[in-house]
């Protein structure tokens, strides 16, 4: 306790000394001194656009501000000189099933996103990454929540993963100029925030949802499988495109390191055989 007190007092004194030194350096002669801008440089080729999802179509984006449109976002990117851009495009926004259960595009929605990408390209964006966080569920099957994933190792789980492969094959073919596909978002988030088992429900208590929360190891397993199958689909349509691992949830979550280690272990482990052959370059 005494050491903490001394440390806090030392910080306070140092901050005070810096303030005094700063004020002491100002005198009457400084009034006519030129105010110079800070010296820094910006490599615009490294600028990366990320934004509030604009209102692309009915029930797509604009949740926070209906005034944010694709044109406005593109104009701002052009003004800033942004060259790379992360575009949110959930698979559920552009895919559906026909009466026979085949995966098909929602053509109107797909065209809206193509137009959005064209606006960005017109304003100078050269690298577009499509980001998804809402996967389609196999035809004829229901689930308790849009973010629910079937239990690993089940037949439904295999169908789910194969549909991810089919989805990304179609998506990569529909966007031949897209260079990167981020195949999930914060799948390691706690409490089933972005990934859960069927049975998880909004409004349920933590105790009621507890059986439907993936462990860190299970989150890593599902993430590795998603990357594997999405990569197969993307590469089938566009061998030059890249699959990007889902962005990490890193707020007050010490399990992040274990999650990343488990993904690596799942990829390189020779005992990881519940799906297909797993060469490490077939993931990302």
PLM regions: where:
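Bacterial N-terminal signal peptides
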Residues: 13-22
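Bacterial N-terminal signal peptides that target proteins for export
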Residues: 2-12
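Bacterial Sec-dependent N-terminal signal peptides
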Residues: 21-40
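Distinct, well-ordered alpha-helical segments
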Residues: 252-271
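Boundary/entry segment of secreted carbohydrate-active catalytic domains
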Residues: 34-83, 88
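Short, acidic/polar
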Residues: 63-77, 163-170, 260-263
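Substrate-binding cleft and catalytic face of glycoside hydrolase catalytic domains
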Residues: 80-99, 111-254
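Conserved small/polar residues in nucleotide/adenosyl-binding loops
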Residues: 273-280
